[in-house]
Amino acid sequence: MTSGPSQPFPSASGPDDGPSWPRILGRLTTGQNLPNGHAAWAMDQIMTGAATPAQISGFAVSMKMKRPTASEVRELADIMLTHARRVPTDEIGTDTVDIVGTGGDGANTVNLSTMASIVVAACGVPVVKHGNRAASSLSGGADTLEALGVRIDLGPDDVARSVREVGIGFAFAPQFHPSYKHASIVRREIGVPTVFNLLGPLTNPAGPRAGLIGCAWADLAEVMAGVFAARGSSVLVVHGDDGLDELTTTTTSTIWRVQGGTMERLTFDPAAFGFKRAEISELVGGDASENAAEARAVLGGAKGPVRDAVVLNAAGAMVAHAGLASDAQWLPAWEAGLARAVEAIDSGAAEQLLARWVRFGQQL
């Protein structure tokens, strides 16, 4: 297949070495990394509608099986962002935080990152949550927020205004990545995790510089951390050692701490902070209305394993946000984050913030 006239990635090495689908898929299916620029070329073909569904699915699956490099994934994410609608940051800035995971862990837990986002915002840390409807679980973050009464369909200006006025905004992926529709159809049809699972957390249209980013695959968590390190972000990329794309309370988690362009791998045990071990069954959710009811209960002060996991993940996001300052210290940041998260729930601040967020959407 020839590249279209809009193709902005010509090869400097002549036509024989330039990117093409047979060349790219040939390399990926034999386990070879792509030359610089080839992943970007492929993603541009996908985003402009020039790639066929067969080419998209072949690329998505073979790239995941080959195990993408950080530079390949960064090319994919950067091209996706060039095609995106962006949230204006002239007033809200980029010292914001996102709490989001790749999905694909198969555990169907309650929406921990969604609840944690509300708690973090109630602590005064500005949040821009990037999310979507469920792909493999019963209820994604967008589904649960909608069931809570939050408007999920806001455009760029209103998301920025939501962050400014409420302290949190939700960027619904289909609103901001319309060109991604070609890939999302294929992704739904093939129904297995692909390299595209990594891109959601890497393509927040508000460009937050901090994040608690969950990855369901331990080997790919390190790849994601490499992309964030290249961007100079302050991020904790986390993988529950039980397979969750969250900081888990059932066992330890592996954390890739990204700060100042460097990456450090750590084993994190919540028991060190006094958390009881949970069973995975205690964190399992249901449909959107059931998960919304659970969120209301937790934000209303209900104790138990779900609250523990929400507090832990909210604290992790605040640790990442604290890392934007070069003098941030690991243990004091955790202690402060955990105390702030508990206070935000127990004082009623988190519940009140959700009510303000719902009201904001109703008044638009």
UniProtKB/Swiss-Prot annotation:
EC nos: 2.4.2.18
Cofactor: Mg(2+)
Positions that bind anthranilate 1: G101, N132
Chain segments carrying region Disordered: 1-22
Pathway assigned to this chain's UniProt record: Amino-acid biosynthesis; L-tryptophan biosynthesis; L-tryptophan from chorismate: step 2/5
Entry-linked SUPFAM superfamilies: Nucleoside phosphorylase/phosphoribosyltransferase catalytic domain, Nucleoside phosphorylase/phosphoribosyltransferase N-terminal domain
Binding residue positions for anthranilate 2: R187
Gene Ontology CC annotations of this record: cytosol
Residues holding Mg(2+) 2: D245, E246
Keyword hit for Ligase: no
General function of this protein: Catalyzes the transfer of the phosphoribosyl group of 5-phosphorylribose-1-pyrophosphate (PRPP) to anthranilate to yield N-(5'-phosphoribosyl)-anthranilate (PRA).
Protein name listed in UniProt: Anthranilate phosphoribosyltransferase
UniProt organism field: Mycolicibacterium smegmatis (strain ATCC 700084 / mc(2)155)
Primary gene name: trpD
